């Protein structure tokens, strides 16, 4: 169920990184996981993962990351994200992508830290990214057995809906 959840988180980054006002249509999928159900409203129909950047190197690395992540090669995908972060360390969406990979690899503390860093770097107006990060934090805390912390993260994410 965690892999299914993190796959949904991965797909939702498309909405997260888009400039506000871009049109997207949600894909409704039934899920037993309430966090995954919340993410469904942020999924694009085609499942595309997009991240708009101005640096050509970062854009290329993002595309490679996305292809590798979709192919299930998380180690190589993580490497591409690390390269992109080295070029643009203040890119909140890159840190969120890194958090997602760490979550999928069950590195819960690192996933939480990366998502928190992404929230710190995200603009106030980027509610979808901040919402996504709080869902990652919630899942990471659940994975560590920190149920009180997970509940706090759930409250924070609900403020952004």
How should these model regions be labeled?
Residues 51-76:
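Alpha-helical segment of the N-proximal tetratricopeptide repeat
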Residues 16-42:
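Bacterial Sec signal peptide processing site at the extreme N-terminus
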């Amino acid at each position: 169920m965690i892999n299914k959840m993190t796959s949904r988180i991965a797909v939702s980054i498309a909405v997260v990184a888009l400039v506000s006002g871009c049109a997207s249509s949600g894909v409704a999928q039934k899920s037993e996981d309430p966090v995954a159900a919340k993410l469904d409203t942020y999924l694009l129909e085609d499942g595309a993962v997009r991240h708009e950047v101005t640096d050509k190197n970062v854009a290329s690395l993002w595309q490679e990351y996305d292809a590798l992540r979709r192919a299930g090669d998380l180690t190589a995908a993580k490497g591409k994200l690390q390269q992109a972060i080295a070029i643009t360390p203040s890119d909140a969406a890159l840190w969120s992508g890194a958090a997602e990979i760490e979550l999928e690899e069950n590195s819960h503390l690192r996933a939480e830290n990366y998502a928190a860093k992404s929230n710190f770097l995200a603009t106030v107006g980027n509610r979808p990214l901040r919402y996504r990060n709080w869902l990652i934090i919630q899942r990471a805390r659940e994975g560590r057995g920190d149920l009180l912390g997970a509940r706090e993260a759930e409250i924070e994410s609900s403020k952004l809906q």
